[in-house]
């Protein structure tokens, strides 16, 4: 609510980071640090707008701890030229990310993207042909989400 209000009233891009609930003053520094981390991740993964909590980036935090050389190795093993086409096409990547963020819900994704349902299904089929991953299925969606995170971390 607050981010939307500030964006509407001030016309400014607003990004809010939320840390963790603390049991007292001694944990405030940790919570603040986590809020800053959420903001840093939001810039890379969400365009730096909206409200973001530290918890929503737990997988990113875990993958960031893996040495870059291992991530690059994993990415080069998995990604072929066709998969890179999906990652380099902003429209396709946005479609996939929105689909994943709406819990694999076709109707909600098409509404959020102002797109006809059949157009969305066509794009999801195109992603499946390029990657071999049917992101409508949870296991493939998880794999694809991990690939997106690794890809964005490698571009950072």
Q: Predicted segment positions?
A:
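Cytosolic nucleotide-utilizing catalytic cores of signal-transduction proteins
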Residues: 1-156
